[in-house]
Swiss-Prot record:
Residues 39-124 form the Core-binding (CB) domain. It comes from Chlamydia muridarum (strain MoPn / Nigg). Belongs to the 'phage' integrase family. InterPro entries: CB, DNA_brk_join_enz, Integrase-like_cat_sf, Integrase_catalytic, Tyrosine_recombinase_XerCD. Keywords: DNA integration, DNA recombination, DNA-binding, Plasmid, Viral genome integration, Virus entry into host cell. This is Virulence plasmid integrase pGP8-D. The keyword Nucleotide-binding does not apply. Residues 152-327 form the Tyr recombinase domain. GO terms for molecular function: DNA binding. The active site is at 189, 214, 279, 282, 305, 314 (o-(3'-phospho-dna)-tyrosine intermediate). Pfam families: Phage_integrase.
Amino acid sequence: MGKGILSLQQEMPLEYIGKSYQEVLKIRQESYWKRMRSFSLFEVIMHWTASLNQHTCRSYRGSFLALEKIGLLSLDMNLQEFSLLNHNLILDAIKKIPSSKASWTEGTKQVRAASYISLTRFLNRMTQGIVSIAQPSKQENSRTFFKTREIVKTNAMNRLQTASFLKELKKINPRDWLIAQTMLQGGKRSSEVLSLEIDQICFQQATISFSQLKNRQTEKRIIITYPQKFMHALREYIGPRRGLVFVTSSGKMVGLRQIARTFSQAGLQASIPFKITPHVLRATAVTEYKRLGCSDSDIMKVTGHTTAKMVFAYDKSSREDNASKKMALI
């Protein structure tokens, strides 16, 4: 499938060198136009999203299936038909979907719109501009994108809840208990911990080195220091093995669904009033580091956030607990 779609970008034969620019341009556009009829929107989306990271791939594919379900798009149409659509109108329609037709939150609508824009950008490049790029509205009263909340929706545990959660998790699965502690101390995403290799650990210095890849290009190395008690437990768990740190009984990488299940179960057993997901641990780490008085720049060195604004979004401590509560200026 991939090679077929890449055939959209065939080079022009040398026999056209003697022709004028306008003639060659017309021939090239016609050639692209004819080939576009051979590809369905569905196969293009499947090819394109396969090149994205797992989370984005799943999100984008879900978006297009949802758009087809409510009748805004047909995945069976070919690229010629898709290129003739008014993409800006479709963006506007996504934002104006009534709740009677689809119970989408504003955040969901913006994800659907972003998916659509990304697709048109990809196809604009693949078709040498025949498919136009959908343009988001920037008018004050009808913006396609705007901030829906100041902080992330994810809950964070307090110290007592964290201790209770870890206690229950250890009873359920000691390996997942180690995974949770690795995530908490470093404010790490589940993917960063589940893919961790043993050679990234330095037991002598009690550190673990994490690599974050931004936009699949810029690599950022983050070193997290762990308590000796934890490192001892981790060393005992690993034993003489090599390769991945956390593995299943068959030696494979632990899946996200596995820890999502045990984390949720431990949260229930600890009587925590909200569902514990892997992402809750990241929000908990930021909130706890802030409570302990760490600066945003120090927290960024731990979590890998690129701006203080992102740290603020994850900080779930009370907004009343600020400088005005600690000192009086009048």
